[in-house]
Each structure stands twice: as C-alpha cells, then as structure tokens.
Amino acid sequence: MTKFIFVTGGVVSSLGKGIAAASIAAILESRGLNVTMLKLDPYINVDPGTMSPFQHGEVFVTDDGAETDLDLGHYERFIDSTMTRRNSFSTGQVYENVIAKERRGDYLGGTVQVIPHITDEIKRRIHEGAAGYDVAIVEIGGTVGDIESLPFLEAIRQMRSQLGRNNTLFAHLSYVPYIAAAGEIKTKPTQHTVKEMLSIGLQPDILICRMDRTMPADERRKIALFCNVEERAIVGSYDVDSIYECPEMLHDQGIDNIITEQLQLNVQQADLTAWKKIVHAIQNPKHTVKIAMVGKYVDLTESYKSLIEALKHAGIHTETDVQITFVDSESIEKNNGDVSMLKDMDAILVPGGFGSRGVEGKIAAVRYARENNVPYLGICLGMQIALIEYARDVAGLKGANSTEFDLKCAAPVVALIDEWQTADGSVETRDESADLGGTMRLGAQEVELKAGSLAAKIYGSGHIRERHRHRYEVNNNYVPQLEKAGLVIGGVSAGRERLVETIELPNHPWFFACQFHPEFTSNPRKGHPLFTAFVKAALNNKKA
C-alpha cells in the first residue's frame, strides 16, 4: 500500500515547499524506497502553458508532453523518477473533468457539489499518480487559508480519515521571521497558520520552519507546545548557498526517522554520499566562467529555472563556478544593438521564449558571438534567432524572419508548424486560429543526428530523445540555401517531416543551437552532455 506525505505551506508563498518536498523525497529514496511526487495547483487555469512567465515562472515540460509547474523540474532533479501528466493537476483540470462527467450523466441527475464530487476527483487523481510506489509526496500549492486551496485540503483531510495515521503524514512549512529591530525570532505567524490548519481538521505531524538562522531550543519548545507537535518534529529549513544542501540539512535533523516511524517503514539507513559529493563540487570549484544569458524575462529569473540549474550541473561536472549574467535583450534593442556588455563574457546563451519583444536584441547577440568566435548555445527560440541572423547576414536572404514576428516577411525562414508526427506515431495539425493552450509540439521527440556533426560528438550517439515546447519551426524550403551558405543541419526529427532540430557552424570554435529543451532532463547527479560541452567550450575560450 502506498504511503502518503502531504506538504502544505503557510504564512506566505515562495517559502520553498517544492525544495523541501523534493529533499524529503531524495532522503527517502536514499533509504531504498520507490518514491514519486505530485503537485496540486489550486489555480483555475487548466495548466500553466498559457500563463505569463512573469506570473508563474518557468513552464516545465514532462516526457509525455504535459505543461506543468516548475516544481516538477525540482522533483526530477532530486529523485530518479520521470514525471508525467499524472504528477501534476490543477483546479481547472479537476473541474473540467467533473463537469464533463456531469454532462455525460455520470452522476445520474444528482446535484454536483464540491463535497463529495470535487474532493472525490482530487482523491482519485492523487491515487492514480501514486499507484505502484512505496511513498507519494504530495505538494499542495498556495498557502493554507487561501480560498482556492480549500477543496484540496478537504480532500487530504478525508484521506487521513480513510487511510489512517500510519499511512498518511502532514508536513507543514511555515515562516519564522527574525525581527532585527527587536533582536527576536517570532513564532506567532507559525502558531496562526497551524491554528488555520486545525480549523479545517488538519493537524501537522511535522513543522518545517523556514528561517534565516538556527532555531534556539526555547523557541523550538514554544512552537511544539502551542502547535501540538512533537519537539523533535520541529525542523529548521535554513538559508543555504545551494538547494542541493537541503537533503543533508533535513536529514541531520532526523526528519526521515520521524517519517519512517510514523509510516511504519522498515528500511535501510539513508546514504547521502552522492549529495555530499555534489555539494563538495559546488563548494570547491577549480575554474570560473562567465556566461551571458540574453533573454527578455530576465527580471524574473525563475522563468529560466531549469536552464540555470542545468548550467550549475555542468559546473559540478567540470569543477567550474558558472557565473551567469542576465542581459535584457530589449535593452540591446533600445540601444541600437549595443552589445558592449558581452565583451567580457566567455560564452553566450539565448534561451527559449515567445513573441517579438526583444528579438532584434537577441539577433545582435548572436551576430556578436558568430563574428567574434564566442561559444554560443541557442535553445528553442535561440536556435530560430541564430538561423534568422545567419540567413540575413551570411546567406543574403533579405527580409529573413519568423512569421511569429512578421507574418508578411519576405523570407519566412521560420514558420508555424502546420503538421507533425508525434513520438507515438500519430499526426497533429495546427493553423493560425488554433487555441494557444496545449497545442504546441510538446514532450519527448526522437532526433536523428548527422554522423560527424558537433551534435553527434556532444551526445556520443546518432539518435537521441529530447523534450520540446514550440509552435514555430525552421521552414524546410529554405534549408538548401542555408546549407549552401555553410550552415550545418546536425539533427532532424525522426518523423516523416524531417524538421530541423539542431544547427551548427563548422568554421566556429563552438556554435550550436537546438530546437528542443535539453535543460528539462539535466540533473545534478549526471548533468547533461550538451551543457557540459558548452561550459567546456567557455573554459577553452577563456584560456584562449
């Protein structure tokens, strides 16, 4: 029978529930348990696919093509389990399914209500996502007290009642502030958030206290007394230099022993050797490189969360401190293409994105990298931008652009994909009038790499599988002209469309761009060959 750990948060948002939940999962996995994780989002959007990065941060894409919360990226980076669309659902999906059942007549004319119909659907989805695992860690998005979260909290209250205390555990994350003017740690916010939980029938078994300093023993006793939680189950979650220090930090306070005792799990002791090696590598780099990330969401770096982590992973595996400088592509555009801020950079990266804002600034960055032999990595839109720059400045295609930015451009070297074959062999079609939500080329797709290409050398294989999230693609009608001008198509899709997947420049020290998102499959234990190669290229450029 699957055991459930429910992780909730109180007082304020952005405390790090996802990191805490993933750290617990990593510790339990090191004890020999088969662990999965679920994220329940209370917003009414069906998924975050159409949400602004400034509103939501990064959209993480799963292997099976679900557009999900960025916390699923943390889950995959912390445990050896691949997330699917079953590992994430929102209020929008729950209501969508319940209403569809009502329209079919599945409720036999009954009045459809939050209890039991919505809560039953939530429980059904939790059990579905947890099936086959020893332990499922379920993170409830939002903050206890939010009206949107109530159906989810009621559902897990019912699960505790139905499954019992030895099969369910509630871990609540709270904020314990330090008031500098008074020189005191304040526990009152934590007392109030637990009071809020108790009002809806939830008693925390573990309190994880988010703090910027170690908790004094008397404050721990005070929280335990007022919140009716064992003193040893008051666990501190302190500020650390790297999120990968969190599993060891929580383990050192005995959190996994509390969990295994309550859930009656007879398992081996935790072995966090791999995590200690990761932390040691982060804390003891032998080299330093500066990488410019040129994008338009740089005011909220959470928009590039997986990408930032992938570069850090490459740093771990090359013993390098990767220092990222975020460059606003729109500022380059406004300053007439001034890229002087790139001159001290060892490499340049242009990430994915949507829309025309800041595009010419990105093109200027690509031009600088190409003309000055600076290592360049383009991802998704970053590949399309590189191709547009090459088409304009090298192949002589005047007016080269993407129809995403200019529907009537003279040379549409990038255009809307109107038809493609998915990984399972089915064919999808789109046009300009299609809905935006869930209509892109999504999830893992097969890619064939050209023998002898930089792509094949990086991956050490002629066939790879990478995740995608895009609506526009290289226009194959222009490929012959671009190849004649020297561009190398290093990878194409394995389907009948032979869509361009990677491009490279043979007479450049290291210039590579891909249509897919390799950052979604990087983790600190293994890294990713593409990012490792990119950081090595940056190191070589620095030495040169």
Swiss-Prot record:
SUPFAM superfamilies: Class I glutamine amidotransferase-like, P-loop containing nucleoside triphosphate hydrolases
Pathway membership, UniProt: Pyrimidine metabolism; CTP biosynthesis via de novo pathway; CTP from UDP: step 2/2
Enzyme class: ligase
Superkingdom to which the source organism belongs: Bacteria
Residues the entry annotates as binding Mg(2+): D71, E139
Keywords: ATP-binding, Glutamine amidotransferase, Ligase, Magnesium, Metal-binding, Nucleotide-binding, Pyrimidine biosynthesis
Chain sites annotated for binding ATP: S14, L15, G16, K17, G18, I19, D71
One GO MF term attached to the UniProt entry: identical protein binding
Region (Amidoligase domain): 1-265
Residues that coordinate or bind L-glutamine: G353, L381, G382, M383, Q384, E404, R471
CDD domains per the UniProt record, alphabetical: CTPS_N (cd03113), GATase1_CTP_Synthase (cd01746)
GO cellular component: cytosol
Protein name: CTP synthase
Source organism per UniProt: Neisseria meningitidis serogroup C (strain 053442)
